[in-house]
Amino acid sequence: MTTLRIATRKSPLALWQSEHVAAALRQHHPGLEVVLVPMSTRGDEVLDRSLAAIGDKGLFLKELELAMLRGDADCAVHSFKDVPMELDDPFVLPAILERGDPADALVSNLYASLQALPLGARVGTSSLRRQAQLRAARPDLELIDLRGNVNTRLAKLDNGGYDAIVLACAGLQRLGLDERISARLDAPEWLPAPAQGAVAVECRGDDARIHSLLAVLDAGRTRACVEAERAMNRALHGSCHVPVAALARWEGEGLFLQGMVGSASDGRLIHADAHGSADDTQDLGRRVAQGLFDKGAAQLLAAL
């Protein structure tokens, strides 16, 4: 086989990520032709409700997975934070690329920080995780749902609908929009979504040739971090659309994992953290989840 077909969403960020994967594959496999197969997903098309309100798992994956099952694509590229905790058979993730910036960004045309926003400022985000942390930091803010791709959200800000919006740093940086970042929202005060900033490549587990072609892109240190974060989320019975945050980083030869569960309605936040071995990321994730449960996380999650 001399051609590899990558199923991808049509947004500028998704196309950038898929072309980034394609370029890396061409470099590793001279002579391999890599082409993109752009398509729309339910998550792209339903824009009048928040992701949490839509509720389906795999909102940004299903159409891409169907393309692989039909034989119309060989693999798919995803923002890892959008990937459900459990993949359907026969799908696997042979490659997780080196992580970009995991932090969130405050974007505003007038204000340089979260604390600089005026009383009652209008802030756009549909993420329950971001809403919970915004309410904790600034309970006076008016939080307004905001959906669409990065450029659509920026246009809504520029048209005066919001005083500020919250986006992922990695998405802005990948699109060459670093200058739009007014302030980074950083750990430990502010935590990102599990696996935020990481790109995952999915394929059929029963296609050994495709799996082998893709596996050369896997970044082991990134995989360890995001697997610990997702293990915590899985132990909380969470999904991509609940107010759960996590960030793991390397400390020496091991990992340090910080986790958070929040309430988007009143800004209550529960934090826990732990150190653990990179050889047992599942145990580390479970221990941080248990620390959150011990502090009352189940009650916050049950209120959703």
Swiss-Prot record:
Keywords assigned: Porphyrin biosynthesis, Transferase
Pfam families: Porphobil_deam, Porphobil_deamC
GO terms of molecular function: hydroxymethylbilane synthase activity
Protein origin, superkingdom: Bacteria
Pathway(s) where this gene product acts: Porphyrin-containing compound metabolism; protoporphyrin-IX biosynthesis; coproporphyrinogen-III from 5-aminolevulinate: step 2/4
Top-level EC class as recorded in UniProt: transferase
Family matches, as InterPro entries: HemC, Porphobilin_deaminase_cofac_BS, Porphobilin_deaminase_N, Porphobilinogen_deaminase_C, Porphobilinogen_deaminase_C_sf
EC number assigned by the record: 2.5.1.61
Cited CDD domains: PBP2_EcHMBS_like
UniProt modified residues of type S-(dipyrrolylmethanemethyl)cysteine: C240
Catalytic reactions of this protein: 4 porphobilinogen + H2O = hydroxymethylbilane + 4 NH4(+)
Family annotation (PROSITE patterns): PORPHOBILINOGEN_DEAM
Cofactor(s) recorded in Swiss-Prot or TrEMBL: dipyrromethane
Co-factor remark: Binds 1 dipyrromethane group covalently.
CC terms in the record's Gene Ontology section: cytoplasm
GO BP terms in the entry: protoporphyrinogen IX biosynthetic process
More details: The porphobilinogen subunits are added to the dipyrromethane group.
Family recorded in the similarity comment: Belongs to the HMBS family.
HAMAP family assigned to the protein according to its UniProt record, in alphabetical order: Porphobil_deam
Function: Tetrapolymerization of the monopyrrole PBG into the hydroxymethylbilane pre-uroporphyrinogen in several discrete steps.
UniProt protein name: Porphobilinogen deaminase
